[in-house]
Design a protein with these regions (language model features):
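Bacterial N-terminal signal peptides that target proteins for export
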Residues: 2-14
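Gram-negative and organellar
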Residues: 27-469
Length: 469
């Protein structure tokens, strides 16, 4: 590993030490650390035959460092939260990683790091933070201000730069779909088709009006817009509503409107009745990816999915719990014929674009023993799938040592890929030992057997440390 990633981690640790030394008398701090060693291999099918794939080794070390602080005296008015990830892949030389867009053999990602201040109903957050609503989850570097009155009425506003893979200590996890992280390699080669705007800063701003817990009812109306070099990359309006007071009737509904094309992007509605020994819920959804406006998929062919679910949970007295669920999905292939890029042929007798199925399961918890069995079947668009999943675990010595296992069986008949057909088996074993009250070590083995990739073996070693100062 180069000195870059460890140096960043040392700088973060030094900053944390200064903060601890300066405010320890009136503050509390929580330190969380995880080290992962990952050993497995992936199969590459390009330039190889299905029977003789190229094996790509993965030998990764990943370290997570989380440091949180808050005040003890004044009701946690001031605080900060942070999480840093440092990783190195010893099975991927850095020279090979540079040949692929968005691939890194070693680096550091600042997942989030922000300072928080709250007083008299106001809440301020400054730094890298995540934001979630009905349409998406994103990360941005900037400021969020929120106010909530004693009556439950409030508002929030936020502005900053969208966190993208090409940014400083950034990951591409939360950036819009449908585009590459960067064209730096193509630009260096003088490729005329390279896009320099992929790494351009993307300003983001938005706001929401809020109503919280008025006789069990909460609601919000929001707006968000992002720009790349002055052009709109994303513009959305959202509305959400919730009702619930524990047992009895509970409901949630929301919609996400794409203002750039002025059409419904996401929607969800759920009604649930919670009784003492049972619960019944019905849900309807419209789902599709959140594409960047620079993506060809956004303008050419989107694939929204409409889905309906009906579920019944039964939890009688005793250690057993049961559920049964029915699911139906309708897949849309919306091709923009106005662009004249392609034509959709409607063939009589073609495969249906819907799937139907369901699942059922039971769980058991008695003392230190826990177990669950789930069965799932779906048929229709894309073929059929039958899944059986059994998990079991036991805690020894008051949970200081735990042993968990999982067995999975799937019978798949994929209508698009003939190699995805037959029986697929998987097994996992997770052993975990508490070294101290704050530290725990774990070892995970995974084995998969199937006609597609034949055999896959994976090993993970984890060391977790959690301490309060």
């Amino acid at each position: 590993m180069s000195d870059t990633a460890p140096r960043r981690l040392r700088h973060t640790a030094c900053l944390a030490a200064l903060l601890l030394s300066g405010t320890a008398s009136a503050s509390a701090f929580q330190l969380e650390m995880r080290t992962e060693a990952q050993v497995y291999q992936m199969r590459a099918w390009r330039d190889s035959s299905p029977d003789e794939p190229v094996l790509l080794p993965r030998r990764r070390i990943v370290q997570y460092l989380g440091l949180n602080g808050y005040e003890l005296v004044t009701g946690q008015d001031v605080g900060f939260e942070s999480s840093l990830r440092v990783f190195a892949d010893f099975g991927l030389p850095q020279g090979e990683a540079l040949k692929l867009d968005g691939l890194r053999s070693e680096d550091a990602d600042l997942l989030y790091a922000f300072v928080r201040y709250g007083t008299h109903g106001f809440d301020f957050r400054l730094g890298r933070q995540t934001y979630t609503d009905i349409s998406d989850i994103l990360a941005f570097d900037g400021l969020r201000v929120r106010y909530m009155s004693p009556l439950g009425l409030g508002a929030e506003a936020y502005a900053g730069l969208w966190v993208k893979g090409a940014g400083f200590l950034s990951s591409s996890v939360y950036q819009p779909d449908g585009t590459r992280e960067s064209d730096a390699r193509r630009l260096a080669q003088g490729d005329p088709d390279a896009d320099p705007t992929l790494t351009a800063p993307e300003p983001l701003y938005g706001a929401r009006l809020l109503l919280e817990n008025y006789k069990g009812f909460s609601a919000s109306v929001g707006y968000r817009k992002a720009l790349v070099e002055g052009k709109t990359d994303l513009e959305r309006a959202t509305v959400e509503a919730r009702y619930g007071r524990g047992r009895g009737l509970n409901a949630i509904a929301g919609a996400d409107l794409d203002l750039l094309q002025f059409k419904l992007a996401q929607a969800r509605a759920q009604v649930r009745w919670d009784g003492e020994q049972y619960a019944v819920s019905g849900e309807a959804m419209r789902l599709q990816p959140v594409y960047s406006a620079d993506s060809i998929w956004y303008w050419f062919a989107t694939a929204p999915r409409d889905e309906a679910r009906l579920r019944v949970d039964f939890y009688p007295r005793g250690p057993l719990r049961y559920y049964v669920q029915g699911v139906g999905s309708l897949y849309h292939t919306e091709i923009n014929s106005g662009l004249q890029l392609a034509k959709a042929d409607l063939v009589t007798g073609s495969a249906p674009t819907y799937t139907v199925g369901g699942s059922a399961g039971a769980s058991l918890r008695r003392g230190s023993l826990r177990s669950a069995l789930d069965l799932t079947y779906r048929y229709g668009y894309g073929g059929s799938q039958l899944w059986a999943d059994l998990t079991a675990g036991y805690g020894f010595r008051d949970g200081r040592f735990t042993l968990d296992g999982r067995l999975s069986l799937a019978h798949i008949a994929d209508g698009f890929n003939p190699l995805l057909a037959g029986n697929f088996f998987g097994a996992q074993l997770w052993a975990s030992q508490a070294v101290t009250q704050a530290a725990r070590v774990s070892l995970v083995f995974e084995q998969n057997v199937n006609p597609y990739t034949h055999y896959d073996s994976k090993v993970f070693f984890l060391f977790d440390l959690k301490a309060s100062l």
